[in-house]
Regions:
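Transmembrane helix-loop junctions in multi-pass membrane proteins
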Residues: 25, 76-82, 123-126, 210-223, ...
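Extracellular loop-to-transmembrane helix junctions
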Residues: 55-84, 132-171, 362-369, 404, ...
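Alpha-helical membrane segments and immediately flanking helix-loop junctions
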Residues: 100-133, 159-163, 168-184, 201-207, ...
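Flexible loop linkers connecting adjacent transmembrane helices
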Residues: 79-107, 129-131, 135-139, 151-192, ...
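Helix-loop-helix module between adjacent transmembrane segments
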Residues: 73-74, 116, 145-172, 181-218, ...
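Extracellular/periplasmic helix-exit of transmembrane alpha-helices
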Residues: 26-27, 156-164, 168, 281-299, ...
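Membrane-interface loop-to-helix entry segments
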Residues: 68, 73-89, 198, 202, ...
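N-terminal alpha-helical transmembrane segments of multi-pass membrane transport
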Residues: 2-121, 131-138, 149, 484-516
């Protein structure tokens, strides 16, 4: 009850501070801010998303950077994404989970927290845009990229646990900031300075990304979807973004003030719920159009290798699919390693196995269902504006059952909320890495995070959000570069653990022990 009052009080204080801004937004202040930030945002975004041309298609360098790493990791660890898939499920189920191990959350809770940060609006809006611009064949390449991305998650989450800081009060702090600085210093004195620089860069990018893509964008897009289903411009909510932002910030405050254990408890409930809501709705549409399913899969496979009418041909299709997978599951970005590092385990590689499920669920399952719905209903549109992805998916849902956009709205709200609470944790850990772990730095970050929710819902700050989105993908450069130096460390952890697993030397707990 005390935490509830504290959360509401924090949100009300933030609302009071921002009320004048939301009013000024009606007078164009948000446009002035947007115009002032735009030149810098465009420069940063242009640099981070710099591209080169292949068959007339612009290929972002960051996309190649992420996919090359995923492919290298898959080969280096001998297709661990497939070999350890079954064992990962055993760990999620708790078969080998020592309740006395260091850490704050279970394997399942860590996975749910990380999933809540990746399974979001990109799975709904981004897939619709990818299929529209790349055709049904983009789905094939999206799935392939998701499978490769599993190896990236394995590596970064193993390192996140291995190099985390464990404190006397039982809390932990981990993620790329720690394995870049501590891991590279451990490898060689010559790499110590590089590790510190990469860690600071990652933390700075992570803080920026948490305020935009992990916060303002989520609040902005979920508010737009709610307005859309309640009457559009005529909706009584149309000019009340500040009110929506206030309510959401209060709900977020109730969760994040309790730390990772509170976040994990909530996400472990929300993630299964939102997955069931969205996946069930998608499967209902697929079932009602079951006769179209064979043709849809035929179009996916045919379109993957023979793309007529698609800009850039097969290369264009491949890029759209790979782009959506990479931008959706964030494999190689490093964000998920922060959540996974809080797990209770004494064997770092176990969380790497659990993390394999993140890209699989996010991309291979959820994104594929969205793609099938778009293809089967025939609502994909090559002329679609990238900002209209949610509307396109909503139209696909509505084409089968008129009230299904409401189901989609519930999913959007759940996706956005869960993404915000997860990214608040990512940003906080990066913030405290930069400014120290104290009560003041903790409260300062959380108040700022809650403030940005209200701003995101009530103001149109496109350039600010674009800049922050660029920060998320900028995280990939220091993260992946550092990981290359640490691959032998992960290999040693894997070989030692896998030998114990294969020879039956691992202790089982709970129901798993009783089954033996």
């Amino acid at each position: 009850m005390a935490r509830t009052r504290t959360g509401l009080a924090a949100a009300l204080v933030v609302a009071g501070m921002l009320a004048p801004l939301s009013a000024f937004a009606q007078q164009g202040v948000d446009q002035q801010i947007n115009d002032a930030v735009k030149p810098y945002a465009d420069a940063v975004s242009g640099f981070i998303f710099s591209s080169f041309s292949v068959a007339g298609v612009q290929v972002p360098f960051v996309l190649v950077w992420l996919l090359a790493a995923a492919t290298i990791f898959t080969l280096y660890f001998r297709f661990i994404n497939f070999r350890a898939f079954r064992h990962g499920f055993q760990l999620v189920r708790g078969d080998y989970s020592d309740p006395l191990a260091a850490g704050e959350v279970t394997h399942f809770q860590a996975l749910a927290t990380a999933l809540s940060g990746t399974v979001g609006l990109g799975n709904i809006a981004g897939v619709a845009v990818a299929v529209s611009l790349g055709g049904p064949g983009a789905t094939f390449w999206m799935i392939l990229a998701g499978l490769l991305g599993m190896s990236s998650k394995f590596v970064e989450c193993t390192l996140g646990v291995k190099y985390r800081n464990e404190y006397t009060d039982g809390t932990v702090s981990g993620g790329p900031m720690y394995y870049l600085s501590k891991g590279l210093a451990e490898r060689s004195d010559k790499l110590k300075t590089l590790g510190k620089v990469l860690a600071v860069l990652f933390a700075m990018f992570c803080v920026g990304g948490s305020f935009g893509g992990g916060n303002m964008f989520q609040a902005n897009q979920s508010f737009k979807q709610l307005v859309s289903v309640t009457g559009g411009d005529l909706s009584w909510l149309a000019d009340k973004g500040w009110l929506f932002g206030l309510v959401v910030s209060a709900l977020v405050a109730l969760v994040i003030l309790g730390g990772i254990q509170s976040i994990a408890r909530v996400t472990s409930k929300i993630v299964p719920l939102m997955a069931v809501v969205y996946v069930t709705a998608g499967l209902v549409i697929i079932f009602l159009n079951i006769s179209e399913v064979p043709a849809a899969f035929a179009a996916i496979f045919a379109g993957a290798f023979s793309a007529q009418g698609i800009a850039g041909g097969v290369i264009g299709v491949l890029i759209q699919g790979f782009k959506r997978a990479a931008f959706s599951n964030e494999a190689g970005i490093g964000s998920a390693a922060i959540a996974h590092s809080a797990v209770r385990t004494n064997r770092p590689v176990t969380e790497g196995f659990v993390a394999l499920y993140e890209p699989f669920i996010d991309t291979v399952v959820v994104c594929t269902i969205t793609a099938l719905v778009i293809i089967i209903t025939g609502t994909w549109d090559p002329s679609v504006d990238p900002s209209e992805g949610v509307a396109l998916t909503s139209a696909a849902f509505e084409s089968t059952i008129s009230w299904f956009p409401w189901v989609l709205t519930v999913a959007v709200l759940l996706f956005a909320f869960s993404t915000m609470i997860s990214w608040s944790y990512y940003g906080l850990k990066a913030w405290t890495y930069l400014f120290g772990d104290s009560l003041i730095t903790d409260i300062t970050y959380k108040v700022l995070f809650l403030a940005f929710i209200i701003l995101g819902a009530s103001m149109q700050l496109g350039a600010v959000i674009d800049f922050s989105d660029a920060m998320i993908f900028a995280m990939a450069f220091p993260n992946v570069l550092g990981i290359y130096f640490l691959l032998p460390v992960v290999r040693q952890e894997l070989d030692e653990y896998w030998a114990d697993y294969k020879e039956g030397r691992l202790k089982k707990f709970g129901k798993a022990a009783n089954r033996d």
